[in-house]
Amino acid sequence: MQEVQQWAASKGVIWLLVNSAGQHSGSYRDAATAKKEWDELKIKATAWIDDHDGKVGKLYGMRTTPHMFVIDQKGSLAYQGAIDDRPEPEGDPRKARNYVREAITKLMARGKIEVAETRSYGCGVKYSN
């Protein structure tokens, strides 16, 4: 995912990482912990949003982590779902069909996104309520 983040940033895309885990969840990160993990994992997102109350996640219907959302230049949802077509952890993710990269590429070319929604995969979001 970091390679896709870096690629997107090079195209001027704003990449927001939203942590909707409740404060009592093992997945919750405060700002200092998140920053440390960003550095260790070489995360290239534009910004991190602490959504511990889950308002943003619930607004978008976020079910898993990751659950990807691509918003177009007008602020409309253009794609949502999995980052790619490989839910299993084995294998090279660079060989997967990357739905997020495809959506961004099509939007930048003013084209039509072929796959606008897929089923996200990963661990369930642990909302506080």
Regions found by a protein language model. Name each.
Residues Y28, A47, R94-N98:
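Soluble non-cytosolic domains of exported or imported proteins
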Residues M1-E40, H52-K58:
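Structural microenvironment flanking redox-active thiols in thiol-disulfide oxidoreductases
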Residues Q5-A8, L41, Y60, M108-K112, ...:
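Sec/Tat-exported extracytoplasmic proteins
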